[in-house]
């Protein structure tokens, strides 16, 4: 995985928008402090400054390396996940990433060694070993993942040695995850560390037999049940899913993932690296897929059917597309021409663009918290027109963007929801806190319905237009 630091650039001139939408000077998309101006660009002037440490003193919504590792590994349903650090690091485990399970619920239970001051002085290795043995005795998990945090990393606890000792005592797989938060400013390193853990300690250790036309879904985390709709369509095509890495998965399924005939790469940051490594180590080919949006789903299913030579499946897929178009038409009639702002993960940012085109809507702004240069290049390629790109926006900067350009819809996560509402801008949850699946054709209908409800709710006609504290003037930005 590429963790290089630098700006993305693309000097290609994009055709103008079909809406009356003008963007100011490239360095004055919004008013902010000089060191942040490069993070807000017009796509015609290249991508924004990205993949850099946040400016000291600025509020950021980014997560840490440990946060990146845990969202990849914790959806493994029958494993125990022990956080070796202060109890605060183990927060929000019950509904981690919104991942649903049709199997065990053990992954939702949070375990922490709850390091305190005396452990910083005397070390926490004994406490960690005791915790591992206790969890194994009470819950008997298929495997135990142990996550290092900033505190345990600073005091020098050797979690690898403790895990080796615990593995000998329990007979279970006890797997260290060296995910100290201070290792990088970008949680993407945590994604890669988690992938390395799976490659080195899990994948390849299983011996289950798999049949013909078998695949792994790599980078699918079953948010709100997305995985189940993908599996339903693949099974109708005669394709079997060996393992989902990692949503609604088990340790045994992932351990046999190397036997699948094809890897389907769903989320670029979490899965591109692991798919490339599996091809090197096990010879498993991979193709990129995207099951969000009507056309993206169609293209993905056709690519899979071509790989396995399933000619009849292609006709069935095209029939599903026509049926979905008919059902989406009533939403498109009320959404045509509306403007959209996006602030999500890098992979989601570009995949949303075509989906909104299917609804007749136009993306005028797109940003990410941890985007890499390639993410912004893909956003520009998918858009084909000029738009505003921004990186790691803090709440004041975000409020300024929304106030200045007033999109008809803002798509982001729970942390940005109430900012949007306070500004009188309709909002759609797309990250981990949504409750409806958005994958494939049925999921796209759910998405269209949610967007229509948000944009065309009568409440916005009753609410007076609002600004947010003079857009941050009181913070000394002017």
From Swiss-Prot:
Pfam families: Oxidored_nitro
Coiled coil regions in record: none
Listed pathway(s): Cofactor biosynthesis; Fe-Mo cofactor biosynthesis
Magnesium found in the keyword field: no
GO BP term (any one): nitrogen fixation
Top-rank taxon, per record: Archaea
Keyword match Thylakoid: no
An MF annotation (GO) of this entry: nitrogenase activity
Keywords: Nitrogen fixation
Record's function text: This protein may play a role in the biosynthesis of the prosthetic group of nitrogenase (FeMo cofactor).
Family statement: Belongs to the NifD/NifK/NifE/NifN family.
Name this polypeptide is given: Nitrogenase iron-molybdenum cofactor biosynthesis protein NifE
Lineage: Archaea, Methanobacteriati, Methanobacteriota, Methanomada group, Methanobacteria
């Amino acid at each position: 995985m590429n963790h290089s630091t630098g700006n993305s650039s693309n000097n290609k001139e994009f055709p103008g928008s079909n809406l009356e939408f003008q963007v100011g000077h490239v360095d004055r998309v919004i008013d902010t402090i000089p060191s942040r101006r490069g993070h807000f660009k017009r796509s015609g002037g290249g991508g924004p400054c990205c993949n850099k440490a946040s400016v000291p003193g600025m509020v950021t919504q980014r997560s840490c390396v440990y946060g990146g590792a845990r969202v990849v590994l914790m959806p493994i349903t029958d494993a125990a996940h022990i956080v070796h650090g202060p109890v605060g690091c183990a927060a929000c485990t019950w509904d981690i990433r919104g991942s649903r399970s049709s199997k065990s619920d053990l992954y939702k239970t949070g375990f922490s060694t709850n390091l305190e001051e005396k452990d910083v002085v005397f070390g926490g290795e004994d406490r960690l070993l005791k915790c591992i043995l206790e969890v194994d005795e009470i819950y008997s998990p298929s495997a135990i993942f142990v996550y290092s945090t900033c505190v345990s990393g600073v005091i020098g606890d050797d979690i690898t040695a403790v895990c080796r000792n615990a593995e000998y005592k329990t007979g279970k797989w006890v797997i260290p995850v060296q995910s100290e938060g201070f290792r990088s400013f970008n949680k993407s390193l945590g994604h890669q560390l988690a992938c390395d853990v799976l490659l080195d300690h899990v994948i390849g250790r299983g011996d289950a037999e798999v049949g013909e036309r078998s695949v792994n879904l790599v980078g699918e985390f079953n948010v709100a049940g997305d995985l189940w709709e993908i599996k339903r369509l693949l099974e109708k095509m005669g394709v079997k899913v060996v393992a989902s890495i990692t949503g609604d998965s088990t340790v045994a399924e992932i351990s046999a993932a190397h036997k699948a005939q094809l890897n389907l790469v769903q989320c670029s940051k979490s899965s591109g690296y692991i798919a490339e490594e599996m091809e090197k180590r096990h010879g498993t080919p991979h193709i990129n897929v995207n099951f969000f949006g009507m056309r993206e789903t169609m293209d993905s299913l056709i690519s899979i059917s071509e790989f396995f030579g399933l000619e009849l499946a292609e006709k069935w897929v095209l029939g599903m597309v026509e049926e979905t178009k008919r059902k989406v038409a009533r939403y498109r009639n009320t959404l045509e021409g509306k403007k959209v702002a996006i602030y999500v993960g890098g992979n989601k940012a570009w995949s949303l663009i075509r989906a909104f085109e299917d609804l007749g809507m136009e993306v005028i702004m797109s940003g990410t918290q941890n985007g890499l240069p390639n993410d912004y290049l893909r956003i520009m390629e998918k858009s084909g027109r000029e738009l505003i790109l921004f990186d790691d926006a803090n709440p004041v900067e975000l409020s300024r963007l929304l106030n200045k350009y007033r999109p008809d819809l803002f798509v982001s996560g729970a942390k940005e929801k109430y900012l949007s509402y306070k500004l009188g801008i309709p909002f759609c949850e797309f990250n981990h806190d949504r409750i409806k699946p958005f994958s494939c054709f049925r999921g796209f209908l759910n998405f269209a319905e949610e967007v229509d409800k948000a944009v065309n709710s009568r409440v916005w006609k009753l609410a007076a237009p609002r600004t947010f504290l003079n857009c941050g003037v009181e913070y000394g930005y002017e």
